[in-house]
């Protein structure tokens, strides 16, 4: 009995041993497998990518991006299928609109007739029709005034801009930028005509004080008249070469326009540009195209020509002074011009260009043969003393034809026979027949 009490363990002793075992220190579960790697330092650290261990959050992001990629692929496939199903005409229209957006749309030019309010106006186009249109908000309203040129949308004709320089392109072409090569030395004879045009056109522009001291007003314009080929246009070219003033050249037929009112408008633009670039000279060749005598006509074209001439009369001697703007006109038929056009006050000097006399013919022949290689037997006296009505243009044609005949026969010198044959050819073509004595 005593043995069992001293040597045996009771139930209370077993519980005590279990408590001692639980109190023992247990190390935490390591969170990283393997040894801790040392951080690399130095220049090689930037080139190495950091190690990313897979986590739950990264896995979710990857799945989300893959899902978005699938959606984008589905959308791309859907758009591709829709493009294939689209009709051919609709596809071409869309491509055409893209091309138009890239290269821009053209704009038409109109004239502002009247401003209704801040957002609306009445404009007219080149075809003569008027439109009630809107003014877009980005247009500078301070630049809008009746009569100015505006840019219009080609579909709705809305005002989308203002042209600052509203000069007609036809007037810009009329302005002579480069002076002609002809000078007074290239004109044979015509000494009196040269003196008169210098007194009427050049001196008032270069030395206006001479006329102020004399107490007279300089001539406003001159008209050059005479047979064809007598040097009227040549003298005008020499004036453009000698003077430093702006030279505007226009042919009378250019002032005849297709639409109603364009001819008078072109005349106004011509003189407005001349005043802006004063001192200037306006040369109107073949003035008889618009300056013929007025008469009652039922033709709309004839009435438009007469309105153009009336505008020219107003510009020559109207209410406003033209300043340093001189006018030179040229015509072959002065007897057909309207008396109001060539009266004093508008055209103060009428300069006649007759056919050349013997002295003038000799000078013209000398000018045109100065650069030609002539044979020893050439005597121009027979051509000069002839009673044929030769103009300066005819003499130039004779010299040119003689040179061509020598060139045809491979000769470098022009003989007297060449001049005789060339004269016969020129007279034959001029008279449109056979001259007398050709076959005698």
UniProtKB/Swiss-Prot annotation:
Residues bearing PTM Phosphothreonine: 53, 434
* UniProt modified residues of type N6-acetyllysine: 258
Q: Which residues carry this modification: Phosphoserine?
A: 4
Sequence intervals crossing the membrane: none
Q: Where is the composition biased (Gly residues)?
A: 1-13
What SMART domains does the annotation carry? AAA (SM00382)
- Kindly list the GO CC terms recorded for this protein: cytosol; membrane; nucleoplasm; nucleus; proteasome accessory complex; proteasome complex; proteasome regulatory particle, base subcomplex
Q: Where in this protein does the record say Phosphotyrosine is found? A: 439
Tell me one GO biological process term.
Answer: proteasome-mediated ubiquitin-dependent protein catabolic process
Q: Give the residue ranges for region: Disordered.
A: 1-49, 84-104
**Cross-link Glycyl lysine isopeptide (Lys-Gly) (interchain with G-Cter in ubiquitin) residue location(s):** 237
The record's subcellular location field reads: Cytoplasm; Nucleus; Membrane
Annotated GO molecular function terms are:
ATP binding; ATP hydrolysis activity; proteasome-activating activity; RNA binding
Ranges of compositional bias, category Basic and acidic residues: 14-26, 86-103
Q: How does it sit in the membrane?
A: Lipid-anchor
Report the main location listed first in the record.
cytoplasm
Which residues are listed under lipidation as N-myristoyl glycine? 2
Q: Which InterPro entries match?
A: 26S_Proteasome_ATPase, AAA+_ATPase, AAA_lid_3, ATPase_AAA_core, ATPase_AAA_CS, NA-bd_OB-fold, P-loop_NTPase, Prot_ATP_ID_OB_2nd
Q: What is the effect of changing residue 328 to T?
A: In BKAH; uncertain significance; contrary to the wild type, it fails to rescue eye defects in Rpt2-null Drosophila
Tell me its family: Belongs to the AAA ATPase family.
The UniProt subunit note reads as follows: Component of the 19S proteasome regulatory particle complex. The 26S proteasome consists of a 20S core particle (CP) and two 19S regulatory subunits (RP). The regulatory particle is made of a lid composed of 9 subunits, a base containing 6 ATPases including PSMC1 and few additional components. Interacts with SCA7. Interacts with NGLY1. Interacts with PAAF1.
By its UniProt entry, which PANTHER family does this protein fall under? 26S PROTEASOME REGULATORY SUBUNIT
Q: What is this protein called?
A: 26S proteasome regulatory subunit 4
Species of the source: Homo sapiens (Human)
| Name of the gene | PSMC1
């Amino acid at each position: 009995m005593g043995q069992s009490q001293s040597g045996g363990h009771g139930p209370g002793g077993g519980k005590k041993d279990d408590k001692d075992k639980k109190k023992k220190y247990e190390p935490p579960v390591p969170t990283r497998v393997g040894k801790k790697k040392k951080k690399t330092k130095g220049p090689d650290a930037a080139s190495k990518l950091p190690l990313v261990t897979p986590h739950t959050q990264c896995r979710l992001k990857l799945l989300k991006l893959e899902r978005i990629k699938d959606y984008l692929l589905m959308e791309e496939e859907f758009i591709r299928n829709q493009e294939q199903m689209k009709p051919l005409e609709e596809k071409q229209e869309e491509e055409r609109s893209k091309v138009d957006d890239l290269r821009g749309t053209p704009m038409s030019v109109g004239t502002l007739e009247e401003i209704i309010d801040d957002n609306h106006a009445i404009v007219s186009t080149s075809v003569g029709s008027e439109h009630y249109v809107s003014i877009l908000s980005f247009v500078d309203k301070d630049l809008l005034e009746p009569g100015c040129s505006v840019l219009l949308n080609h579909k709705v004709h809305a005002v989308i801009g203002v042209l600052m320089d509203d000069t007609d392109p036809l007037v810009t072409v009329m302005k002579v930028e480069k002076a002609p090569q002809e000078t007074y030395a290239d004109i044979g004879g015509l000494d009196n005509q040269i003196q008169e045009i210098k007194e009427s056109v050049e001196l008032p522009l270069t030395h206006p004080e001479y006329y102020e001291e004399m107490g007279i007003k300089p001539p406003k314009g001159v008209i050059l008249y005479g047979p064809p080929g007598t040097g009227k246009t040549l003298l005008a070219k020499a004036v453009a070469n000698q003077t430093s003033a702006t030279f505007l050249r226009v042919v009378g037929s250019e002032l005849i326009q297709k639409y109603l009112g364009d001819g008078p408008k072109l005349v106004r633009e011509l003189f407005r540009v001349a005043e802006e670039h004063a001192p200037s000279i306006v040369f109107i060749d073949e003035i008889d195209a618009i300056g013929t005598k007025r008469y009652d006509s039922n033709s709309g074209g004839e009435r438009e020509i007469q309105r153009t001439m009336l505008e020219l009369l107003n510009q020559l001697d109207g209410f406003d002074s033209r300043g340093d703007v001189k006018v030179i006109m040229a015509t072959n038929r002065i007897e057909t011009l309207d008396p109001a056009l060539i009266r004093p006050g508008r055209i103060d000097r009428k300069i006649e260009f007759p056919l050349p006399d013997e002295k003038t013919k000799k000078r013209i022949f000398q000018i045109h043969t100065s650069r030609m290689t002539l044979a020893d037997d050439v005597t121009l006296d027979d051509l000069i003393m002839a009673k044929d009505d030769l103009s300066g243009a005819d003499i130039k044609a004779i010299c040119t034809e003689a040179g061509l005949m020598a060139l045809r026969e491979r000769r470098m010198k022009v003989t007297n026979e060449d001049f005789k044959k060339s004269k016969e050819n020129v007279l034959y073509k001029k008279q449109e027949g056979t001259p007398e004595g050709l076959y005698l």
